[in-house]
Amino acid sequence: VEWMAQGQIANPRSSFAPQIRQAVEDGYRRLLAPSIERELRAESTAACDEHAISTFSRNLRQLLLQPPLKGRTVLGVDPGFRTGCKVAVVDATGKHLGGATIYPHEPQRRWDEAKATLHGLLAEHGATVIAIGNGTASRETERLAAEVIAEAADPQGLAYVMVSEAGASVYSASELARAEFPDLDVSMRGAVSIGRRLQDPLAELVKID
C-alpha cells in the first residue's frame, strides 16, 4: 500500500498527502485486494480442477483397460469390521455359487472360524482366486487371505488380488442387482460384484448407474 501511495503522491509534504494515502489504502483493501484474491482463487481452482480431471481420467482408463481373468472361479470378499466380511463365490461365467458372512476383525475377532469358512468355500467350489475389495478393513482382510493361502494344500494354485470396490454399493442397491439376485441382501450382492470385477472389469463396471 505504501509503495502504491508513493506513486500517487507528488509532494509528500503536501497537506493532501494523508488524504491521498488514505484513499489509496481504502481503494486497495476494499476494491483491488478482493479482486486479486478472487482472480488467484479462480486460477487455483481451475488448475485443481484440471489436475483432478486428469487424475480421474487416468485412473478410469486404467480401470477400464484391466485385462479380464477368464475361466477362473473367484471368491469375492467385501471387507468390513462390525458387520463382518461378506463372501461370495462366482464361477467362471459369473454365476453365484454360494457364500457366507465371516467376522475375523474387531469387535468379534473370530479369526480361526473365518479361515475355516474360507477354506471350506475354496474347496467346495474350486475357487482359485480371492478378490478383496479395497475399502474398509481391506488390509486386515488381505492378511487373512494370505494366511488361508499359506495353509492351503496347494498354495501355489491360489492367489488373492485387491480389487477396486468403487461403485459396488451403488450397483448392489440398484434395480438391476435386485432383479439379478432377488434372494441376496445388498452387501452380499456387493461381494458378488467384487468377484465379477476381477473376472471381467468392463462388463461389471458398465452396470453402475
Show the residue positions of the predicted features.
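Phosphate- and other anionic-substrate recognition elements at nucleic-acid/protein interfaces
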Residues: 51-64, 70-73, 77, 82-209
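Extended, highly charged clamp/arch subdomains and adjacent linkers
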Residues: 1-73, 92, 115-120, 124
